[in-house]
Every structure is written in C-alpha cells, then in structure tokens.
Amino acid sequence: MTEGAGHRDGELPDDLTAAEAGMWQAFRNGSVYDLSSGDALVDDPHGGRAWGPERTVRARIVCWLLLDGPPALAGRVSSLQLVGVRISDTMDLAGGTVDPYVELRACRFDREVLLPETRFTTVRLVDCSVPRLEAARLQTEGDLHLPRCRFRSGIRLTDAQIGTDLLLNQAVVHRDRSGRSIAADGMTVGQDLQAEMLESHGEVSLRSAQVGVSLSLRGARLLNPYTRHALNAPQLTVERTLYMTPAGLGSPLLRGTTPAQGTRIQRFECEGGVRLDDGRFGDAVDFEHARFTFTDEQELSLRRVQTPELRFLGERPARGRVVLSGARVVNLMDRADSWPGPGRLHMG
C-alpha cells in the first residue's frame, strides 16, 4: 500500500516495521506503547546503551500519525503515548495542527524536534533525550510539559503561546550556537511557568515574556560563565510571584513553606548576570536563600522594576553589583547581610 492510501479505514500500511506497526495500533486504541526492556541502565534515555530496531520508529511515521492518522477504534480516543521509544531522523511538525493527545516518556530522539508554528492541545515530553527543541510561535490550548528532559543544544520558544502551564522542572538544557539555553522572548504562558530545579548552561532569555500566574525557579541552577547574563528578562510580566528560592529534594517540591526538620533542600543558584529591568510583578519577587555568583562586571539589575514586595533575603554576592535605580517597591523584606558591600549597591 502506498503511504496514505486506505489508512482512513484503519488498514495497516505495508511498509511499517514491527515496532511501527505496534505504535500504529496503540495510537488507534489510545493506549500506552511501551518498548522499555525493564533494565534501568538500558532504558535510561540519557545513557550510552544502544537502542536497536526493535525499539526504533521513524520520525515520519510519528508525524503521519499526529497530522493525518487513522481513525480511532470504536469506543476509543486516539492518542500517541510512547515509553522507551527511539525516534530516528528529524521529527518535523512545523506549521501543522495536532489534535491527538501526545505524551512521550523516557524516549530518545536522534535529531532535533521541529515544532515552529505548530498547534497542539496538550503535549508532554517527560524524561526524554532531545538534541534540540525548535518551537518558535508554538501554540498549545493546554500544557507544555518538558520535565526531566535533557536538551543538548537548547530550546527555542520565541513568541510561543502556552494556554495553561509550562513545566521545565528538573530539565537540563545546554546552550545553542548563539549561547542561549532557553530562547523564549515574547512567550506567553496562560498560568504557571514552573522551572524548579532546572539546570541551565547558557543564557535563559525571557525578554518581554508574560506569565499569567507565577514563575518558579525554586532550586534552579542557572550557569552561564560564557557571556554576560545567565537570566536576561527585561520587561518580564508575572501576574503573581517570581520565586528564586530553595526547593526540597524529594517529592513534592517546597512551595514557599517551611521544610520539615531534616529535609534536604537545593537553593537557587545563579552564575552570571541577572537582568529584570522594567519587570512587572503582581505580588512579589522572592530571593530568599538565593546565591548569586558574579564577576566584577556583572550585576543583579532591577532597574525600574515594579512589585508590591521584594524579599531580598539571599546570600551576599561576593562580587558584582545590585542595581535598583528607578525601582518601585511597596514593601521591602531584607537582611543587612544580604546586600553587597560598599560601592556595589546602586539605587539612584
């Protein structure tokens, strides 16, 4: 059978591999398609163990299912739910509209995932290995989940529109050729942006981004010794609170509460400058227990920031400056030992 012919009647295409045929049938049934072996070392998508043809599907077959797939079986709702699957070649859904629910767990992509101007309902990639996610102007009606994924060459979400929540908890993101780990200028998130215990190697760029509820960087590590900023987010708007505070190591993460005695915590750490100039925060900016590591030329810049409350309760930065020129803060919560030394605080 030629590609596309007869598939609307549910007939299985002739040229599918055994792994792809199983995925096709699971899609029609709306069931999870699990190709993991049961061996944790072998199944680690970020490990070095090879995954052979028995657990490999071609990206174009995945795209075929998502863009123009067969009908669901009677009484079922079609969906793509993969576990432990290797996806070969480039997954290119650029400009497409994807109606089925998509959830991939512990999967491995050989090449970048291309989603620019793609429309989804909800899409979840959990604990996946992805060379790069290219998703400028992506639109989702619901959530975009990327927790525990690892991206070797960055994420691009410029001008993306996320209908509800964006989750980046425990993701590891390395920089692209331009030095950015996450490029999300102009992005809009309808509800929460959670990047708790995110590990970023490069610049996180959120210029003019908008978050409908809170932005949580609890326990995150933003590391950018390469260029000026680890977080570059002028004109950022957060309707409630920006958290750069600790997270609990374990489940659930701390959410602004006092941890039980003996609970291990991971503080928010930033190596590189932070630029929040002209930001608008509806409830608070919270730096409790934050650790900033700057060079002499770098700074925590809060020029013209507007917030009802600033919780400046982090560690004193040994180098660099803190700049609050033109900031409008109603209530300041601070400690004397949180501010930088003489000559390194600028408020005029």
Residue spans of the language-model regions?
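N-terminal leader/targeting and pre-domain segments
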Residues: 1-348
